Amino acid sequence: MSYSILVYDLDMRSLGILMLVISAAMAQPHYDLLLKGGHVIDARNRIDDVRDVAIEGGRVARVAPKIDPSEARKVVDAAGLYVTPGLIDIHVHVYKRSNPPPGAQDESVNPDAFSFRSGVTTVVDAGSSGWKDFADFRDHIVKPARTRVLAFLNIVGAGMGTGHDNDAAEMDAEAAARIAKENPDVIVGFKSAHYEGPGWPSIDNAVKAGNLAGLPVMVDFGQITKERNIDTLFLDKLRPGDIFTHCFSGHREETLENGKLNPAMVEGRKRKIIFDIGFGAASFYWYVAVPAYQAGFYPDSISTDLHTNSMNGGMKNLINVMSAILALGSPLPDVIRMATWAPAQEIRRPQLGNLDVGAEADIAVLRVEKGHFGMLDSAGARMPGTERIVCEMTLRKGQVAWDLNGLASEDWQSFHYRKGPYFKSQKDK
C-alpha cells in the first residue's frame, strides 16, 4: 500500500470517528429545560404565537416553533398556557430596616415571599430607602434576595416612613446622585413621595438628582394645591421618561368634577411622561380608570405598590392588577407588555422583560381562566370580569422558583426520595 493511500485511509477513518462523536454528542440532551407548546408573548421580539422555549445554563437558548424534546433533560408541557418574560413590578416596598429609627413605619414585605407566586422575577423598591440608608438596604435586602431587587432612591436621605417626607432639609440631590452613580447595578432612578408643600423642593431635587445621574424620576405626588397641581407638574417640572405613578388614583384631579379625564393627563403624555398604575391601598379607582379608558388613555405600565396595607385589599398581587386591566378592556398582549417590556424600558434595563436568546431565563408561565370574576378597586367597588390570570410557574435564572401544579415535577410514585433520618424505619432506630 502506498504512503498516500495509507494517509487517505487514516484520514477517512479519523473523519468517520469524528462524525460518530459529533452524532453521539448531538443525540445527548443539551438543554436543561424545554417549555413545550406554550403561547409565547414577547413584545420586544414581536412574538404572539405558539413557540417552544429552550433553556440552558440559566439563559434562554432558543425560541422556535418546534424543538425536539429529546434535546432537553426536562420537558414541561405548556400547551394551553402563556409563556412570557418574567414580570416586572416597578412599584413595591420591600425594605425592612435592620435598625429602624424610633417611630419609623414599616409596611414593607419580604420580596421572595410575594414575587414568584405572581410570576414576578424583578421588583423595584419605590423609595423606601434614601441615600443615608441605601447601604443597609443593599446588604440586607438586595443581596440575599432570590428575586432581582432594584430601587428608586428616595430623594429624602432617611427614606420613606421615617417622618421626613416633608423635610426639605433632608432632600440632597448631590448626595442622592452620588449614591446612584456608586450603585448603578441596583439604582434605576429617584423617588419623590408624599410631599405636601409648600413649593416644589421634593420634585425639584429629585429631578436635579436625575439630571446629575442621568436617571428617571418616579413621582408619588403629594397634596395638590392651587399652586401645586398636575398641570404644572407635567408641563414645567417633569422630563420625558419620568414616571407618574398612581395614575388612576383620583387624588390629584386626574379626572375633573364632570367625570371627564383631566386634559393635563393628555398633555403630559404628549411630553412623554410615563403613566404607571401603582394600585396600592388607596390609589386605584374605577371612577377614574373607566373615564380614562373611554377617552383612549391607557396606562404605560402596571405595578402594585405592594406593601402590608395593600396586599389584602383590591390590589392583592401583580397578576390580579393585570386581570383588572383586562377587565377595563386592554387585550392580553398589551397587558403582558405593560408588565414586562414596557417597565423594562422605563427603568432602562433592556436586558429584562424579553426572551432574547442569551437573556437570563426569567420566565412566567401563566394561565388565563375564563368565567365570571369580580375585580375590586381601592374602595372595594366591584367590576365584573370574564378573565383572570393565574401563575402556573415562574423561572428565575432558569430554575423553577414557583410551580403551582407541579408541571416540572415527577409523580410521587416514580419520584426518588432521598431518605434521611426522618424516613428511618422503627427497626433502624
Roles of regions detected by a PLM:
Residues I22-A24:
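N-terminal signal peptide c-region/cleavage motif recognized by signal peptidases
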Residues P29-L33, V40-G86:
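Histidine-rich, glycine-flanked metal-binding segment
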Residues G38, E360-S414:
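C-terminal cap of metal-dependent C-N hydrolases
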Residues G38, G58, G80, H91, ...:
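Divalent metal-coordination and catalytic microenvironments
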Residues P69, R73, D77-K143:
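Metal-associated gating/positioning segment near the N- to mid-region
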Residues V109-H194:
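Divalent-metal coordination cores built from histidine and acidic residues
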Residues G189-N312:
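Active-site core of metal-dependent hydrolases
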Residues Y287-K370:
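His/Asp/Glu-enriched, well-ordered alpha-helical/loop segment
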